[in-house]
């Protein structure tokens, strides 16, 4: 089985920044990977296209995926509002790791974050389900629009997304 690859075309205040592609670890966390894949294609009638990265902290991570409220309080999974932590086999080993944001145990929806550093304190709390395959330089460029409290100086959006 080949792990799926999805892409995000990132824009800054409506201007194209570039493409980031992700390998989704369907071999280790199939349910979590399938949620992200389907939200990237929009095949269920909802998903990431047009949503923003509402929280970017340089030297830590870029967080997005709230396509219902756009502020970090919303989002939903393809399985209903929330789903369980599938497993914690994969670790937050460094830049480029793709992991689920949550509000405590078994509260995965659609929010995710891309690590820009090793974040081992998140191991066992957040489900790692993918990695940046290409376009880490775009993620690094996104960091410049973040701040210590996570507020972004410009609107960073997923202008387009899908499966490769």
Swiss-Prot record:
EC number in record: 5.2.1.8
Gene3D superfamilies linked: Cyclophilin-like
Highest rank taxon of the organism: Eukaryota
Compartments, as annotated in UniProt: Cytoplasm; Secreted; Nucleus
Keyword Ubl conjugation (UniProt): yes
Modified residues (N-acetylvaline): 2
Residues annotated as glycosylated: 108
CC annotations in GO: cytoplasm; cytosol; extracellular region; nucleus
Positions of modified residues (N6-acetyllysine): 28, 44, 76, 82, 125, 133
Glycyl lysine isopeptide (Lys-Gly) (interchain with G-Cter in SUMO2) crosslink location in chain: 28, 82
PTM info: Acetylation at Lys-125 markedly inhibits catalysis of cis to trans isomerization. PPIA acetylation also antagonizes the immunosuppressive effects of cyclosporine by inhibiting the sequential steps of cyclosporine binding and calcineurin inhibition. Acetylation at Lys-125 favors the interaction with TARDBP.
Description of how activity is regulated: Binds cyclosporin A (CsA). CsA mediates some of its effects via an inhibitory action on PPIase.
Oligomer status and interactors: Interacts with protein phosphatase PPP3CA/calcineurin A. Interacts with isoform 2 of BSG/CD147. Interacts with FOXO1; the interaction promotes FOXO1 dephosphorylation, nuclear accumulation and transcriptional activity. Interacts with integrin ITGA2B:ITGB3; the interaction is ROS and peptidyl-prolyl cis-trans isomerase (PPIase) activity-dependent and is increased in the presence of thrombin. Interacts with MAP3K5.
Family under the similarity heading: Belongs to the cyclophilin-type PPIase family. PPIase A subfamily.
Protein name per the record: Peptidyl-prolyl cis-trans isomerase A
Organism annotation: Oryctolagus cuniculus
């Amino acid at each position: 089985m080949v792990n799926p690859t999805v892409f995000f075309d990132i824009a800054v205040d409506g201007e194209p920044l570039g493409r980031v592609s992700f390998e989704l670890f369907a071999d280790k966390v199939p349910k979590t990977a399938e949620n992200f894949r389907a939200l990237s294609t929009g095949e269920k009638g909802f998903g990431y296209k047009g949503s923003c990265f509402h929280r970017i902290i340089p030297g830590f991570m870029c967080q997005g995926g709230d396509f219902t409220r756009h502020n970090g309080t919303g989002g939903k999974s393809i399985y209903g509002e929330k789903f369980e932590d599938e497993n914690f086999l994969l670790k937050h080993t460094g830049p480029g790791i793709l992991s689920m944001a949550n509000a405590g145990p078994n509260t995965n929806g659609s929010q995710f974050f891309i690590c820009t550093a090793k974040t081992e304190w998140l191991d066992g709390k957040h489900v790692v389900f993918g990695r940046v395959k290409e376009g880490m330089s775009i993620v690094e460029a996104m960091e410049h629009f973040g701040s210590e409290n996570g507020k972004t100086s410009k609107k960073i959006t997923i202008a387009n997304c899908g499966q490769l």
